């Protein structure tokens, strides 16, 4: 909810999803309290079943969640010129885990995007990239 509200406060329309009803309720309350609820839609969604339906997005932010099965859908959902900001647990500097990105995984998985910045280490991986084309 924090990133969604931050983006909404800058005039963007946002859709936030989380598997937790508590997290979604907290995000709605934060958006209401900060006066941006009109720019926000929050839904309880289990991403294990895939991305929810919706139009192309100018920005996708995915924090602390990694499911390789969603990579193609994320790329397809981005509009031309759209930005992807993704962070995940990583095996680089940490041990293996079901939801941990392998070394170089984010770079490889999103190779068709234009990479702006990214890093991995200390158990974290992140990537900022844009989809080729213009909005």
Predicted regions and their residues:
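A short, conserved alpha-helix within the catalytic core of class I
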Residues: 65-78
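A short acidic, Gly/Pro-enriched loop at the edge of an enzyme's catalytic core
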Residues: 48-59
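Conserved SAM-binding loop
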Residues: 27-28
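Conserved SAM/SAH-binding beta-strand->alpha-helix loop
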Residues: 20-22
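Conserved beta-strand signature within the Rossmann-like core of class I S-adenosyl-L-methionine
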Residues: 81-94
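Conserved SAM-binding loop of SAM-dependent methyltransferases across substrates and taxa
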Residues: 1-12
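Conserved SAM-binding strand-loop segment of SAM-dependent methyltransferases
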Residues: 35-48
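Conserved SAM-binding motif I beta-strand of class I
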Residues: 13-18
